[in-house]
Regions:
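Structural/interface elements that position substrates and couple domains in central-metabolism enzymes
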Residues: 1-187
Length: 187
């Protein structure tokens, strides 16, 4: 899909790129389509595509957890007891807003499966998830990366030095297509 987006971006006009990721977030996008669907039903208008999209978006944290578990399993590790560092909890890049961020739900699902969850976000020093877990942003150092069994790229902040992250991480699950290189340790 990333190659298709790059090819489409070569169109000289009339193209707006939309990028896949671990889910939707923010104060309006996760909710507004359901308001529209509700009003449409009053007028006997079928917007089943919005309903289907909403269902898919609600399942994304579990789907992303499966990607994390699969990556760990490929390295002979289980989620249970693994140290999993999430990079970015803001719902979009370069902001300090974690409202409805998909990263928080993925962290909850992973913690529920007994993963040792932590995060780093240069814009958000502390978060509380919908399940009530509170986390403080860890320092992003070579030691923290090396001690993590899995590093999950959840928000594509421009501040993230991808080369530094790649060089110091055992395993990376890239949910934002930030790592350009390929390897056995990049999913």
């Amino acid at each position: 899909i990333w190659e298709v987006i790059e090819a489409a971006k070569t169109k000289p006009f009339g193209f707006q790129a939309f990028y896949p990721g671990p889910g939707i977030g923010g104060h309006c996008i996760p909710l507004d389509p359901f308001y529209l669907e509700h009003i449409a039903k009053k007028y006997d208008f079928d917007l089943s595509m919005i309903h289907a999209a909403g269902h898919i978006n609600m399942r994304m944290p579990h789907y992303m957890y499966i990607k994390i578990a699969t990556a760990l399993n490929s390295h002979k590790k289980a989620v249970n007891g693994s140290s999993i560092l999430f990079l970015g909890v803001a719902y979009k890049p370069d902001i300090n807003d974690e409202r409805e961020s998909p990263a928080l739900d993925i962290m909850d699902v992973t913690a529920h499966k007994s993963g040792d969850v932590s995060y780093h976000d240069p814009y958000i020093p502390e978060v509380k998830t919908s399940e009530g877990r509170t986390y403080i942003s860890a320092d992003l150092s070579a030691e923290v990366l090396a001690n993590s069994d899995c590093v999950v790229l959840t928000t594509n902040h421009k501040d993230f030095d991808i080369d530094f992250i790649s060089e110091n991480s055992k395993l990376i699950v890239d949910l934002r297509n930030m790592v350009e290189e390929e390897g056995d340790n990049i999913f």
